[in-house]
């Protein structure tokens, strides 16, 4: 039996799938991956992207931060791909219990997924740092320079920047889901960014599946490994 057939059988038998995904899930919708060869980290800016999207840079140079953010990190107008759609279908069928994602684009919800734990936040949520009022991603996209609320406060995206902590409630929910899963599918992530990558250590089962174009540090621990595009695999599931 080849690996794809084995994965199909595991999915058929499973009642508690958890999907843990990274940037590679959304690249097939056209959203660039930070760390791929042609991703953000290899492009040329006055500062390294990890400096620009840090909390201290946001505080120190908000105009530059928002210029970069609007241009490079605000993925509007993109649509869910086959992976997002299949996951939403599994949830509807009662097979998938949660999606844990490192992405900030909201495409899982756009595809219909309900239980999504966004480790790094979402560009779709933006709050005034003074009064707490909610603002849309379009508001931030269309604002000139630093987006300001009616009250005069800066509108900050609900995205976890470098030097900021992950939301503890989301971490706890993700850990709980992963530890109870009967099948854990990890896809489109290099598994090198912590603490997010460490979450798969909470999996207790023996059906750990890794799908990623490149090798990851966890390949040796997985029960099934695919070095393929996600779309190619999910189109056959």
Feature roles, as predicted:
Residues 1-237:
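Conserved catalytic core of sirtuin-type NAD+-dependent deacylases
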